[in-house]
Amino acid sequence: MNRKIILAVASIIVSLSAASAQTSEGTFQRYNRWMVGGEFVRNIFHANGFGVTGIYGRQFSEIVFLGAGFGVDTFIYNGGKSTTTITDADGNQTVIIRPPYRYSFLVPVYADLQVNFSRSRSPFFGELKVGGAVQVDLERIRGTHNTNELELLGGGVLMGAAAGKRFALNNGDELSIFLDIDCILGPWYANVPVSLGIRYGF
């Protein structure tokens, strides 16, 4: 099922790229570009986090961009706190409460298709993503003996969609604000991160 969906999305990407190249031939100078930015993320485990993302690809026309994306989303995965009790020579005890100690890193890699809904300098756009992602947890316990444990929690196939608005800058670059919903499914893993972010394209 996943294979059929991926093949269907890939065929749509190829068709749009070809059509865009034909309509822009002789009027648009294609170029490679970067898009980098950050985003606020919330997942189905009710964990909030912040992510950074980068996308590199080719602008085929005023309408179609096709590239490869990657990034890291970081969550405070467990809201608990670690405590340390210190007893001095007189028997007095001091309790130290430390910040949340478990962190989660979601690492996606994906093919990225962005389509502008108009040829204006500041258009609305839609985005499709197909790829994969893994989640790694880091547990830090700080007490009498400090320990750090890294664990591969899981991962799977990533499929996502986004919509947003571009804002053209005077130097020819742009800022994009977007809302993104991803679905990551694996044999023993499921996650649906939702993010609100901003990207700088150049």
Q: Where are the language model's segments positioned?
A:
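Outer-membrane beta-barrel "beta-signal"
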Residues: 113, 190-202
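Gram-negative (and chloroplast) outer-membrane scaffold detector with strong preference
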Residues: 32, 37-42, 50-145, 156-159, ...
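Cleavable N-terminal export/targeting peptides
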Residues: 1-31
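N-terminal glycine-/serine-/threonine-rich phosphate-binding loop
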Residues: 46
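Short, exposed beta-strand-loop hairpins at the edges of beta-sheets
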Residues: 183-188
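Internal, hydrophobic beta-strand segments that form the core of beta-sheet-rich folds
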Residues: 179-180
